Amino acid sequence: MSSERHKYFIEYGINVLRSRHSSIRKLKRLHRPSLHGFRVWPSSWLLIDYFKLSNPVRHSRVLDIGCGWGLAGIYCAKNHSSKVTCVDRDSEVFPYVQLHAEINNVEITAIKTGFETLSGIEMKSYEIMIGADICFWVNMVDTLKSLIHRAFESNIKSVIIADPGRSPFEMLAQYFVNTGIGKIMNWNVTHPYPIQGRILIIR
């Protein structure tokens, strides 16, 4: 076990395994995400820091879309007593989600579906939708607009998305700012390493 100590770390009260940890290496031999779920993306830490300071998710039902390894959702479950469902179109990410849920002693539900097919019926039992690094191609902008509109037509009360500030994200954010229901904030963290980005809050 001591040989593994440098292969994981604790940030914001959650345990995170590095890529070289034996458990992650084992998963990578068995499960290979085909899209972008092969790592923890930086904007997850922007979301987590925002949640720590503003606490909008406490005791809420949270939908973590495009979840990847699911750290933002796991943070919500562990530190804010949220009921979390992780959503991704690539089922190969879910073993990584479940591994991190287990080492953090939380329960996470998983749904395999894409942004285009996540229905209002599936979203109606949730209050908050979150996402990190989920708008990186221009053709995703309209897809996410449609998803967010469906979310508000169901029971979702707010949508919170973090991003480094990619052009597609800025297009999405500006659209919701222009409609009068969106707000963009610059955000940065110093740990686990320096990260700068933007957070879009829609409510």
Where are the language model's segments positioned?
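S-adenosylmethionine-dependent methyltransferases
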Residues: M1-R203
